[in-house]
Amino acid sequence: MGNEKQILSADEIRRALVRIAHEIDERNGGLRDVVLVGIRSRGVPLAERIAAAIADFEGTRIPVGQLDITLYRDDLKLRGPAPRVRKTDLPIDITGKTVVLVDDVLFTGRTVRAALDAIADLGRPARIQLAVLIDRGHRELPIRADFVGKNVPTSLSERVMVRLRETDGVDEVVILRGSAND
């Protein structure tokens, strides 16, 4: 398409996720009490890929869960009368664990705020960290990612689109001219 520009290829996405996996291991002094929790929808396959990368270099599989934040969003009324609620699935009790929330794009911070509210209803982790593939700036809330694949300065008129094999049939990140992400 003429109005999109690729900013990450499949190989660049893979490398960014492997780097994030190593950073999670290093920052936490190991992975004994770490749980990855993907924010639906694209955060889930990213969390699975990070867990696979960790398994490759550590030889151990860490738990991966999925979090639906639909009912925790502050823009629920703006999204129409019947929001689509999907399953939240945490494989273990998160109380006392280090939860690493995983999402594709960090923009205003509102999605992460909703995820923090959802996590608080599910347990009391020792700490919560945030891993994102893309940080595009323009925060409306005081939220910062602990692990970032790539910082991509954007204008408010641009949209960052993460496409993944599992959901879109291709791995790439593109910038589109038009309306912004959440």
Swiss-Prot record:
SUPFAM superfamilies per the UniProt record, alphabetical: PRTase-like (SSF53271)
This enzyme's EC code(s): 2.4.2.9
Keywords of this entry: Glycosyltransferase, Transcription, Transcription regulation, Transferase
Pfam families in UniProt: Pribosyltran
Alphabetical list of InterPro entries matching this protein: PRibTrfase_dom, PRTase-like, PyrR, PyrR_bifunctional
Domain of life: Bacteria
GO biological process, one term: regulation of DNA-templated transcription
Enzymatic reactions: UMP + diphosphate = 5-phospho-alpha-D-ribose 1-diphosphate + uracil
Motif (PRPP-binding): 99-111
GO molecular function: uracil phosphoribosyltransferase activity
Function: Regulates the transcription of the pyrimidine nucleotide (pyr) operon in response to exogenous pyrimidines.
Entry's family note: Belongs to the purine/pyrimidine phosphoribosyltransferase family. PyrR subfamily.
Protein name per UniProt: Bifunctional protein PyrR
